[in-house]
């Protein structure tokens, strides 16, 4: 019998979330971002659930090949662009569009003499990660347009702080829009998830929706439910053992948690090797038998322990939700100093 743990993906939730983001996009073309194996939800599931998206955006040609094999016939965009001259031929074979963010990529395209490559010029409007400075971007676009077989589609940028709670960040959406200048009024794909949800002033003819498609709010101060989003992944497991622990006894590595009363401790078949963070502190909620039980002790590689003293129904075989509909992944992420997307 397999170990009792699974990540269940709700395709209807994915479809619902796409509909929410589609309505927020207000008629603009929508790229569904499926990088990192569709944020851990599976590229095959993404192809099925995001059939109504205008295109899929990912990181490399391996992903593009997978989604083509899964039956995706619409547009595909490489968000980080191509990495080597050898990528140009499969770009064309797979009919994949690519971001261009650096002069070396222009040189590769010029030397490759492509027959049909569609490019999106990345603009560094203040995030300082990828892209040409706003003053350099039109020059890059002109150089690309001069290469036979290359078609420039639009300008693309990415906001560093598009969350609703980031209005006082060192670099704001307004700062980056100002840096874009007239480029923001040309053919452009500007809005990421946060900008789609919280910044209607960001225009452009296309948007890129990421984590919200999977039911995760981009702002930990705003719940997914408040945005109309439904968590699409449920990480579930089962209780595999129970321990009666006396006051003064401790649980787990490092003896981090000590019982203050006679306690009933449940051992759950999930650990950090399964993606549940080892850094999760005591007290983090786990859903079992219709109630929340607190984490009690350090997370092990393939087990964790929870205090079910106040949940008498909890027993060996009881189903446990680590995150999903009842336990918000953003809440867990905040407790261990990361973001929901990482989990």
Segments (PLM) and residue ranges:
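A charged N-terminal "starter" segment
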Residues: 1-97, 116, 151
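Fold-independent oxyanion-binding glycine-rich loops
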Residues: 36, 59-61, 81, 101-103, ...
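Small-residue-enriched segments and motifs
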Residues: 237-239, 293-294
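C-terminal accessory subdomain/extension
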Residues: 244-343
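Residue-level signal for inorganic ion chemistry
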Residues: 14, 67, 155, 239, ...
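Active-site loop/helix belt of alpha/beta enzymes
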Residues: 2-3, 36-51, 89-94, 104-118, ...
């Amino acid at each position: 019998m397999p170990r009792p743990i699974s990540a269940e993906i709700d395709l209807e939730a994915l479809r619902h979330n796409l509909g929410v983001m589609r309505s927020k996009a207000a008629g603009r073309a929508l790229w569904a971002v499926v990088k990192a194996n569709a944020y851990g939800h599976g590229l095959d599931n993404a192809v099925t659930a995001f059939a109504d998206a205008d295109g899929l955006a990912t990181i490399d040609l391996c992903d593009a090949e997978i989604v083509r094999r899964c039956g995706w016939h619409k547009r595909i965009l490489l968000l980080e662009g191509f990495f080597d001259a050898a990528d140009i031929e499969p770009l064309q074979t797979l009919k994949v569009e690519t971001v261009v963010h650096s002069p070396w990529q222009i040189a590769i395209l010029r030397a490759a003499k492509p027959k049909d490559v569609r490019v999106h010029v990345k603009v560094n409007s203040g995030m300082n990660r990828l892209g040409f400075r706003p003053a350099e971007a039109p020059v890059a676009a002109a150089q690309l347009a001069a290469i036979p077989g290359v078609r420039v589609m639009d300008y693309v940028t990415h906001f560093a702080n598009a969350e609703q709670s980031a209005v006082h960040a060192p670099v704001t959406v307004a700062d980056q829009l100002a840096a874009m200048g007239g480029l923001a009024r040309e053919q452009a794909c500007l809005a990421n998830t946060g900008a789609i949800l919280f910044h209607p002033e960001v225009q452009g003819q296309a948007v890129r929706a990421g984590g919200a498609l999977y039911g995760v709010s981009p702002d930990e101060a705003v719940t997914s439910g408040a945005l109309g989003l439904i968590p699409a992944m449920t990480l579930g497991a089962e209780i595999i053992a129970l321990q009666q622990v006396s006051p003064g006894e401790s649980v787990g590595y490092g003896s981090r948690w000590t019982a203050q009363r006679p306690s009933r401790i449940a051992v759950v078949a999930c650990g950090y090797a399964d993606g549940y963070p080892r850094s999760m502190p005591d007290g983090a909620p786990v859903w079992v038998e219709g109630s929340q039980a607190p984490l009690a002790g350090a997370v092990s590689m393939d087990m964790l322990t929870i205090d079910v003293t106040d949940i008498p129904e909890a027993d060996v075989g009881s189903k446990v939700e680590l995150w999903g509909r009842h336990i918000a992944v953003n809440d867990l992420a905040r407790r261990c100093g990361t973001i929901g997307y990482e989990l």
